[in-house]
Amino acid sequence: MDSNIQNVVIDTNVIVSAFLSSHDDVATVLVLNKLYKNEIRLYYSKEVLAEYKDVLNREKFKFDKREVNRFINYVLEKGIVIEPEKINEELIDKKDLPFYEIVMDKSIKESKLITGNIKHFPVKPFIMTPTEFIKIFGK
């Protein structure tokens, strides 16, 4: 594995924001592009995959099914599924816990959690917004 590739966990809100955006130069779209270009390595769990599928297929978003399938297929083919150790941590939104558990898992070296809901998580240098991630690691 290439040591220059960042290990990441991507919160669902980042994917939703990227899908909703009509601009190619916004941070959420740039993060998704880095993923599709294999410039970042995605880690996920069964719970995270289930949330991706559930949220991205919600009728209210009216996302193109091909785009949703492209993302889910990418996750399944290129992402790395893990079963993280359960953490007894109180987060503002309990649905964020699976993402936090992955980024905190000791088996993943120097992972980053990319989220649009930074306030939902403890303040840690490896938990960042899409804009912060792009500023640090480039487009």
What function would you assign to each model-found segment?
Residues 1-44:
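Short, well-structured N-terminal submotif of metal-dependent ribonuclease cores
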Residues 14-15, 48, 99, 119-120, ...:
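Alpha-helix capping/helix-boundary segments
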Residues 17-19, 55, 124, 136-137:
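Residues that scaffold the ATP/ADP-binding catalytic core of kinase and kinase-like folds
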Residues 93-114:
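Acidic, metal-associated active-site segment
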Residues 32-87:
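PIN-domain endoribonuclease scaffold, especially VapC-family toxins
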Residues 108-139:
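Acidic, PIN/NYN-like endoribonuclease modules and their adjacent C-terminal/linker elements
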Residues 89-95, 119:
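Acidic, metal-coordinating catalytic cores used for nucleic-acid/nucleotide bond scission
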Residues 22-25, 30, 58, 126-130:
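Short, glycine/charged-enriched secondary-structure capping and boundary segments
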